[in-house]
From Swiss-Prot:
An annotated GO BP: viral budding from plasma membrane
Locus of motif FPIV motif: 20-23
Main location: virion
Domain of life: Viruses
GO cellular component, one term: viral envelope
Domain observations: Late-budding domains (L domains) are short sequence motifs essential for viral particle budding. They recruit proteins of the host ESCRT machinery (Endosomal Sorting Complex Required for Transport) or ESCRT-associated proteins. The matrix protein contains one L domain: a FPIV motif.
InterPro entries membership: Matrix_C, Matrix_N, Matrix_Paramyxo_C, Matrix_Paramyxo_N
Protein name: Matrix protein
Residue pairs linked by disulfide bridges in the UniProt entry: none
Length: 377
């Protein structure tokens, strides 16, 4: 099967996301305090002609509170309850924040109530109770609440039970500055569309998870031959392209490989709606595929919509994109099983934003490895 390789440089910061080191303050007693931390990322080099916007993500813990209690500060909350589980609450896109000021100090004003519900699957309702004024222009703050998949946004949703009130208290704050043109997401229904009249363009990313040799992840994923963690293959649906011509065999393969190469695809990774893959088509986009890209040929694919289990791993473990391939398949499932994939490795990996730098903190290990951690600073 013909293939075209994509250049990759795992050392490039454009293919990584920096993670928060774990820092605990202790006064010599039994309890430890997990220090609040801020991570800022700048993607302004991707498009210097566009105004900047910011994406805010918070990572922290859900605490339980007896029914009937009023909302209390996190210091009092921590003394009464231990963390139930970890979670991610995404505030979404908002205006440029030229100065963050004492944003970590203002996180004490950030409180979110958590309710569990269900439709076709379990869901979580996050309602903003108190928030720092600096975030008042961001999507979730303006809406006031959001209902999301429990599996995608909560580490262990099975620990959230009836008869209790729960609060989310953020500990880690991620702020990403990026050009406004980048923030385009393909509507979900479009990504699900299949037709016998189109070819489907997929993107396969080989992601190296930078875990330790004794990590349980090594048993779940393929160990890296270089001894640097483990590898996972992630597929994204990029677009559909109408078929044209009446070519067969090698001529057909060459036609689609050339069409894919002409798009000049480039991939990056950044913390936008959580860990997010950014695709940029620098070349010619076929007319039938233009709806899958925004202004300037950009499209974003939040990984929690594609691989929730891997995404929750990336909350606390670093990763880097090592390879990227374009896969051209029949869009129709009945035709897909009768044909072979056309693989084009000519997908560029962004030289500056290819990595999530290895993480030294772990949201998922707190209650296990640090059972006395009940307060947040």
């Amino acid at each position: 099967m013909p293939s075209i390789s994509i250049p990759a440089d795992p050392t490039n910061p454009r293919q990584s996301i920096k993670a928060f080191p774990i820092v605990i303050n202790s006064d010599g007693g039994e309890k430890g305090r997990l220090v609040k931390q801020l991570r800022t990322t700048y993607l302004n080099d991707l498009d210097t002609h566009e105004p900047l916007v910011t994406f805010i993500n918070t990572y922290g813990f859900i605490y339980e509170q007896d029914r009937g209690n009023t909302i209390v500060g996190e210091d009092q909350l921590g003394k009464k309850r231990e963390a139930v589980t970890a979670a991610m609450v995404t505030l979404g896109c908002g205006p440029n924040l030229p100065s963050l000021g004492n944003v970590l100090g203002q996180l004490r004003e950030f409180q979110v109530t958590v309710r569990k519900t269900s439709s076709k699957a379990e869901e979580m309702v996050f309602e903003i109770v108190k928030y720092p004024r600096i975030f008042r222009g961001h999507t979730l703050i303006q809406k006031g609440l959001v209902c999301v998949s429990a599996e995608k946004f909560v580490k262990s949703p099975g620990k959230i039970q009836s008869g209790m009130d729960y609060l989310f208290i953020p500990t880690f704050l991620s702020v990403t500055y990026c050009p406004a043109a980048i923030k385009f997401q393909v509507p979900g229904p479009m990504l699900k569309m299949r037709s016998r009249y189109t070819q489907s363009l997929q993107l396969e990313l080989m992601i190296r998870i930078l875990c330790k040799p004794d990590s349980p992840l090594m048993k779940v994923h393929t160990p890296d031959k270089e001894g640097r963690g483990c590898l996972v293959s992630v597929w994204l649906h990029v677009c559909n392209i109408f078929k044209s011509g009446n070519k067969n065999g090698s001529e057909w393969q060459e036609y689609w490989m050339r069409k894919c190469a002409n798009m000049q695809l480039e991939v990056s990774i950044a913390d936008m709606w959580g860990p997010t893959i950014i695709i940029h088509a620098r070349g010619h986009i076929p007319k039938s595929a233009k709806l899958f890209f925004g202004k300037g040929g950009w499209s974003c694919h939040p990984l929690h919509e594609v691989v929730p289990s891997v995404t929750k791993t990336l909350w606390s473990v670093g990763c880097e994109i090592t390879k990227a391939k374009a896969i051209i398949q029949e869009s129709s499932i009945s035709l897909l099983v009768e044909t072979t994939d056309i693989i084009s490795p000519k997908v560029k990996i962004s030289s500056k934003h290819r990595r999530f730098v290895k993480s030294n903190w772990g949201l998922f290990k707190k209650t296990k490895s640090l059972p006395n951690l009940t307060e947040l600073e």
